[in-house]
Structure formats: structure tokens, C-alpha cells
């Protein structure tokens, strides 16, 4: 019953369409794996499922006024046609016989490269669903849903079957771009050093500092966000990690004399370089989902595995992914280049009021 309520929420969260965006295209679908899911298990009236893994290759035109919301897009490298290229991993689960499905697509916004829909709706764990155990209770399959995931965040570290996105680095007249980077760090346990991101898991590729000289950066600490911050003197911290008894210089970590206090908020501001055009992650979701929903083939006549199989599409996200959903709708990425709605409904779960911070300069999704 709880699963049916979740599914029903997808239809209730139908949001208004937003202004159209510019030309963009899935130019090539690269299918790397295709085969039976769950050993061909029959999921009730829907029957067996198919598992398709690959990569989508995109192009966008920076000069289109409707792409102006993607920060630094005009500073990205261009191909011979004057377009910006990027790519996104994708993972698709679909009924083997489309006629037995419900003609609905559920797009699950991955969280730091990790798939969450099967965990949420099917009570299943795993980032590379392939077996019957990975289907969990089989709810979404018995109901006939097609499930799609695409990479969108350019800072995700490879490994553990995380979904990646290849986003270009912005350059100004061929030279590296530098700018201020703001990082928040909070640890649950006392540690001597920490990677430069909110969570303690090594999942993000950080923007490298221009210099490891702490006099060119600022590190503050406070017991909670409502309290005033205290600056840590530059000789009492370093860009480094603790290895045993040794302090090793590391551009991706911060070391604090006496260690980081559990639960305290540490804020680091430093000069970083080589910003990714992170807003293209929204274009990847928009154009990837639109392709699977509407198109028959890519530019090279590779067939869309969902061609003529989808009538409605919905987007779902939890926490960081929910913030992405909020931002996607607010910034106008729910209409494709042909002025068609990409998603008919959206469910943003435990996202809070924040956005994804992915269309700002030197963006680093929280």
C-alpha cells in the first residue's frame, strides 16, 4: 500500500511547464551492455525486463539566448560546428515487451552518482541492478514502469558503478579560469584531516587550489550555523591529509592542528581553478529524458530503446537529487528544444528549500 501511495504522489506533483530552452541534441547513443534483467524473471503482467547500459553524447549551441542560464557555457571548448560537446552515462530498465508495460517513464536523479529509485520504491540495494535480488520486492516492475538514470554531476569520482558525466572545463582565451571556492565541511567523528566536501565519502573530484599557501585562503569554524565563526590562523591548518603520524600535502584535503571537532561547521574559502560548465548537467537530464521519451533514433540512426513506448514521464529525486529537481523546474529545463514538456510530474523528496547550485560559476553540487 505504501508503494502505491508513493506512486500516486508522482501524479500529484505535476508542475507547470516552463519557458523553452535552446537547441540541444543527443547526437549519439552508445550502448555498451544489453541483456536480460533478473535472469528473465516474469514480473506479473509486465513480464521480463531488459537492462541497457551505455553513454549519451550531446551537443549544445552556446549562442542560443535560451541557453544563457548555463554559466560559462560560452567559455567552453567548441567543435568544428561551433557546438559544445559533453556526455553522460545512462542506465535503463524497461519491459522487454513494451506493449506489456504501463508506458510510463520514471527518471531517477542519481545522488552523487548513485541510483536511489529501487531502494525507495522496491526496497532494494545496489548500484548496478542486474539480478532478481536487485529488483527487491519487484513493485515498479510489476507495475510496468521503465526506469532511467543519467549522469549529471561532473564532480563524481569514478567507481562502484556510479554514473558519470563528462562536462567541459571553461577557459578564457585558452587560459585557465580562477575564482573563489566556498566549501563546507562537517564531520561526525573527531579526525585530524578531512576531504574538501560535506560528506566524508570520497565521491567528489575537488577543484584544485591555485596555491597550497594557507595565507591565500580562509578557514573558519563554529559549533552551529547560527553562531559566529572563528577564523583559524593560517599556521594552524594546511592543505594536507593525515597518514599515520605523517602530514602529507594534499590539494583535496584540509588538516587542522588539534583535529576537526565533531559536529562543528568548517568553512573554507580558497582560490580554485578550472571550473566545469556544471549547468550542462541540467541539459543532460533534459535532453536525455526527452530523447528516450520522444525520438526514434539518434543522428547516426541508432534506435532509441524506448521508441514509441512512453506516453508520460516523471522525475524523482531524494535530498541532493531533490534539490536538483527543484532547480531543474525553476530554471526552465523542463521544456526541450521543440517546446515539448520533458516531464509531466515531479517528486522532490526531503530536499529542503535549497537549489542544486549547479548553474553558478565554479559550481560544486552540495
Task: Give the predicted meaning of each segment.
Residues 1-5:
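Positively charged n-region of N-terminal signal peptides that target proteins for export
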Residues 20-24:
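Sec/Tat signal peptide C-region and signal peptidase I cleavage site
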Amino acid at each position: 500500500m505504501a508503494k502505491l501511495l508513493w506512486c500516486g504522489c508522482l501524479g500529484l506533483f505535476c508542475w507547470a511547464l516552463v519557458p523553452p530552452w535552446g537547441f540541444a541534441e543527443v547526437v549519439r547513443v552508445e550502448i555498451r551492455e544489453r541483456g536480460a534483467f533478473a535472469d528473465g524473471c516474469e514480473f506479473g503482467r509486465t513480464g521480463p525486463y531488459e537492462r541497457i547500459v551505455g553513454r549519451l553524447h550531446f551537443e549544445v549551441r552556446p549562442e542560443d539566448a535560451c541557453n544563457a542560464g548555463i554559466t560559462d557555457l560560452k567559455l567552453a571548448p567548441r567543435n568544428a560546428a561551433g557546438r559544445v560537446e559533453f556526455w553522460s552515462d545512462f542506465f535503463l530498465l524497461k519491459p522487454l515487451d513494451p506493449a506489456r508495460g504501463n508506458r510510463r517513464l520514471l527518471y531517477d536523479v542519481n545522488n552523487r552518482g548513485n541510483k536511489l529509485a529501487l531502494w525507495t520504491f522496491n526496497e532494494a540495494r545496489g548500484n548496478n541492478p542486474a539480478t532478481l535480488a536487485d529488483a527487491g520486492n519487484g513493485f515498479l516492475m510489476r507495475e510496468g514502469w521503465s526506469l532511467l538514470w543519467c549522469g549529471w554531476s561532473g564532480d563524481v569520482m569514478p567507481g562502484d558503478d556510479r554514473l558519470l558525466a563528462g562536462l567541459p572545463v571553461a577557459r578564457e582565451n585558452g587560459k585557465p579560469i580562477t575564482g573563489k571556492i566556498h566549501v563546507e565541511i562537517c564531520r561526525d567523528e573527531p579526525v585530524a584531516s578531512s576531504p574538501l566536501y560535506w560528506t566524508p565519502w570520497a565521491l567528489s573530484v575537488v577543484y584544485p587550489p591555485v596555491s597550497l599557501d594557507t595565507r591565500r585562503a580562509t578557514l573558519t569554524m563554529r559549533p552551529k550555523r547560527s553562531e559566529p565563526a572563528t577564523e583559524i590562523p593560517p599556521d594552524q591548518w594546511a592543505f594536507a591529509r593525515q597518514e599515520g603520524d605523517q602530514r602529507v600535502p594534499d590539494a583535496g584535503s584540509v588538516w587542522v592542528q588539534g583535529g576537526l571537532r565533531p559536529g562543528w561547521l568548517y568553512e573554507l574559502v580558497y582560490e580554485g581553478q578550472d571550473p566545469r560548465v556544471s549547468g550542462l548537467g541540467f541539459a543532460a537530464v533534459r535532453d536525455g529524458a526527452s530523447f528516450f521519451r520522444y525520438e526514434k533514433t539518434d543522428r547516426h540512426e541508432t534506435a532509441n530503446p524506448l521508441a514509441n513506448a512512453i506516453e508520460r514521464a516523471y522525475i524523482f529525486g531524494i535530498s541532493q537529487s531533490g534539490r536538483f529537481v527543484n532547480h531543474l523546474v525553476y530554471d526552465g529545463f523542463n521544456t526541450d528544444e521543440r517546446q515539448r514538456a520533458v516531464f509531466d510530474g515531479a517528486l522532490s523528496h526531503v530536499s529542503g528549500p535549497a537549489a542544486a547550485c549547479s548553474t553558478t560559476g565554479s559550481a560544486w553540487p552540495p
